[in-house]
Each structure stands twice: as C-alpha cells, then as structure tokens.
Amino acid sequence: MTSTGPETSETPGATTQRHGFGIDVGGSGIKGGIVDLDTGQLIGDRIKLLTPQPATPLAVAKTIAEVVNGFGWRGPLGVTYPGVVTHGVVRTAANVDKSWIGTNARDTIGAELGGQQVTILNDADAAGLAETRYGAGKNNPGLVVLLTFGTGIGSAVIHNGTLIPNTEFGHLEVGGKEAEERAASSVKEKNDWTYPKWAKQVIRVLIAIENAIWPDLFIAGGGISRKADKWVPLLENRTPVVPAALQNTAGIVGAAMASVADTTH
C-alpha cells in the first residue's frame, strides 16, 4: 500500500492522526520511518541501511530513495544532515564526503525521488525539535538548548517551540579550545577520563553558553546520555540539565516534523 502523506486519517470514535516521514543520515547508517505527528511515535518498524562509502551526495540520495521506497511513501519528507544546511544547500561536511559542500541537497535527494518535496536540516536541530515537542523538553517554554555529545558536540536552540537553526555550539571557543575538543564524549574516551573529570569540562562549556544566551533548560543527548545518572548530577552550572528522552528516534521524528512545517533556514 502506498502512503501519500503528510496525511490525516480519521476513524469513527478515534482522534485525528497526522503522519509524516523522516530520514536520519549518519556517518554509518541511514534510517527512516513513518511518524505519528500527534504523539511523536514511529508507526511500525524503521528501515536502516548502511551509509554508502564514499558518502557522496548521489550515493546517499540513492540510499535515501531506497529507504523511502521501502515504505511506499510518496509525500513530503524530512532529511537530517550531519552539518550546516542553509536554504537546502550544504555548507559543511564532517562525517560524509567533502563533495557535499555547496551541493543543493534538497534538489539532489528530490530528483532521486521523482520530485517529492524534501526538507533538509541539521541533525542536531532535528533532534532538538523532537525533544522539545515530545521528549525531555516537553512543556518547557522559553529558551531550550539541546547538546549532543559524541564524536563532536552538536547543538540545537529552540525558543518557545521555534527552531533557531545551525548554532554549532560545538565550535564555540572555551578557554582557548573548541567546545567539542574539550567536552565531546570522544575526548572522555580518548583520555580515559572518569565521569567527574569529564563533567568539569562539560560545565565549562555549559557556562560559556549560559553567559551568551541564558537558556531555561539544557537537554543532554548523544549515546553518553544513557548514562546520565553518572554525570548529570555532577554538573554545577546554573541552568537545569536533563537527559534526552527519545534517543535513537529523535532524528527521524524531528525530520518528519520539519517536513510538515518547514522550520529550516
């Protein structure tokens, strides 16, 4: 059965459901699924394929098309990208091929899908949208900052539900180093730091962000957030910090959200 989405389905006695489709592009895998936009839950299973190597724009676009076609989805879709994207054009490339820089990803992916409408946005921005609507930031108005701790540090800023895209706080200079050189979880692993020692570096990054924009809430994401009990209580900055709630689905959900209400820049 082909899904045309974004769609609204009504059943007597049931609430109205809105469906969207999201793709999350990572350095090792490309995953996608249909999302219930009323609840933020995936409908059925997701499909995950290996990211092609080299991860050129055309190779990635073909893999995305394979995922989308696996669901028979024919409507608009959202796609995350691990870097800066403005007006559909890629500006940076870290975990993918450098040939992405300057590529109109929106058009390249759309062409592989026969002209389907594509919204593309930074992967951390997508996760931030999802977490503030359905996850750890739900019912928290004001200025919310998501930080994803991994190989680097990704960031998203959402103000009263509106995304401020491409913040790139991982490249903020903190004490003579970029924030991600100081406090990415990969730095902890490389140096074999204890959680208390690493937390001191995270505090420095959080304070630098606080001094710039005074957020109301930090959401800590990335794989290390699954062990938040070991380090979040050690953070002595002024703004509350909570672990991300959606984990592996946040990118797909946020991308699907963006496809329905284009929040990109």
From Swiss-Prot:
<dbReference type="GO" id="GO:0004340">
    <property type="term" value="F:glucokinase activity"/>
</dbReference>
<protein>
    <recommendedName>
        <fullName>Polyphosphate glucokinase</fullName>
        <ecNumber>2.7.1.63</ecNumber>
        <ecNumber>2.7.1.2</ecNumber>
    </recommendedName>
</protein>
<keyword id="KW-0808">Transferase</keyword>
<feature type="region of interest" description="Disordered">
    <location>
        <begin position="1"/>
        <end position="22"/>
    </location>
</feature>
<feature type="compositionally biased region" description="Polar residues">
    <location>
        <begin position="1"/>
        <end position="18"/>
    </location>
</feature>
<comment type="function">
    <text>Catalyzes the phosphorylation of glucose using polyphosphate or ATP as the phosphoryl donor. Polyphosphate, rather than ATP, seems to be the major phosphate donor for the enzyme in M.tuberculosis. GTP, UTP and CTP can replace ATP as phosphoryl donor.</text>
</comment>
<comment type="similarity">
    <text>Belongs to the ROK (NagC/XylR) family.</text>
</comment>
<dbReference type="GO" id="GO:0047330">
    <property type="term" value="F:polyphosphate-glucose phosphotransferase activity"/>
</dbReference>
<dbReference type="Pfam" id="PF00480">
    <property type="entry name" value="ROK"/>
</dbReference>
<dbReference type="GO" id="GO:0005524">
    <property type="term" value="F:ATP binding"/>
</dbReference>
<keyword id="KW-0547">Nucleotide-binding</keyword>
<keyword id="KW-0418">Kinase</keyword>
<comment type="subunit">
    <text>Homodimer.</text>
</comment>
<dbReference type="InterPro" id="IPR043129">
    <property type="entry name" value="ATPase_NBD"/>
</dbReference>
<dbReference type="InterPro" id="IPR000600">
    <property type="entry name" value="ROK"/>
</dbReference>
<keyword id="KW-0067">ATP-binding</keyword>
<feature type="binding site">
    <location>
        <begin position="24"/>
        <end position="29"/>
    </location>
    <ligand>
        <name>ATP</name>
    </ligand>
</feature>
